[in-house]
Amino acid sequence: MIFKTLWYYWRARKRWKFANRQQLEQHQWRELARFRHRVLTKSPYFSSFGDLSLVEYPLMNKAIMMENFDQMNTAGLKRDELLACARLSEQSRDFKPTVGKFSVGMSSGTSGQRGIFVASPKERSIWAGTLLAKMLPNGLFHGERVALFLRAGNNLYDSVQNRWISFRFFDLFADFNQQVQALVEYQPTIVVAPAQVLRALALKIQQGEASLPPVKVISVAEVLEPQDRQLLKTVFREVGEIYQATEGFLACTCSHGTLHLNEEFLHIEPKWIDESRFNPIITDFTRETQPIVRYKLDDILVVKKAPCDCGNPALAIERIEGRNDDQLILPALAGGTVNIFADPCSRIIANTLPLTSDYRLTQTEWLLKLEGDCVVEVLQQCQSALSDYFAKQGVDIDKIEWQCVSQAILPDLFNKRRRIIRK
């Protein structure tokens, strides 16, 4: 398997490089045509749409995928058998079991429903080779030691173990302090973890409770917000980001720190919310066992206005704002409601709070509860700044009730972090 991984590593690093947008789009359409002919014809579900153009295929989401999984996949796999395998692995914390040759994992269920993802040995090699090509700063043969702080392991991660690079899985369901001690003993060169875990690790280093050499850290599984990035940059040598979901390896940061969509193996249709924000509709033409075709994500992406100096023609993303259900919906002065994006709220709060303070803003009907590990007077300053912003957006702020609560915001390492929540 190592030779296949090396091939896909070379392909991602050297072969699938494009000088301009036109070359990239020509490559996408060639790969999509091959994907439709070689893969979708093997799926009972997708083969029924064979005469349609791609944009005429029905949209997918997690609920549709799970409901039609047995007909969608190309290997005759059964959803319930896969779910049983994945659940057993999560309960036992042993992620070696497979269903035949296929690795199985489960999503975290942030959107309310857990999904499953399946990978063949070939797909594991593609994933591993591509990830290594994009995220290793010194290349494959530099002897990197990579620490993976994840909620669940998977055979995907074991597929890249070799004499040139070592990976170690750190279980987020285990005692965090013990895991940090094991991390110090491992002395990694790269740490991959959710943003809240990297934040907790940075605070431990700042407080003298842990000692690590200068390392590159890569945020995964959660939105890396500006205040967290700023904190991490004060502690670690380099801060990168991977945007990955059950649906695929969607984006990663380049050498200039810009998040680029992985359009070399994804076709992305933007569903525009306004002139700069969109929900991505993705088709992954490298996924053969579990086809991902016109899958609509609830994540809100903001396009970077200026082109990135790295020269990558793939779409550059300014930031990931979170999910549609992270928006606040507040009463409007003119009647009805006003949708307030989470990102401006996060920035207003972050600009007021101390760098090491965390917070949570929760909406329940017209009640906004702001919790933070700082004095209540600072939270009240945040309330005032948010109210001013809401008023400029046409919100009837007199109808909003506030609660400011000074308390520690403990990291919930078992679940994806959401700082702004609408119930």
Regions found by a protein language model. Name each.
Residues S48-L52, D158-V160, A210, L232-K233:
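Short loop/helix-cap segments at secondary-structure boundaries that form the rim of catalytic
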Residues M1-R30, R34-F35, S166-K423:
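Active-site glycine/GP-rich loop and adjacent strand/helix microenvironment
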Residues G105, G109, G129-L136, A147, ...:
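A broadly conserved amphipathic alpha-helix scaffold signal in soluble, globular proteins
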Residues M1-M106, G112-I126, L132-P137, F141, ...:
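Nucleotide 5′-phosphate-binding alpha/beta core
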Residues S108-S111, N162-W164:
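Acidic/polar active-site rim loop that often engages polyanionic ligands
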Residues R114, N154-L156, R287-Q290:
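Short, acidic Gly/Pro/Ser/Thr-rich loop/turn segments
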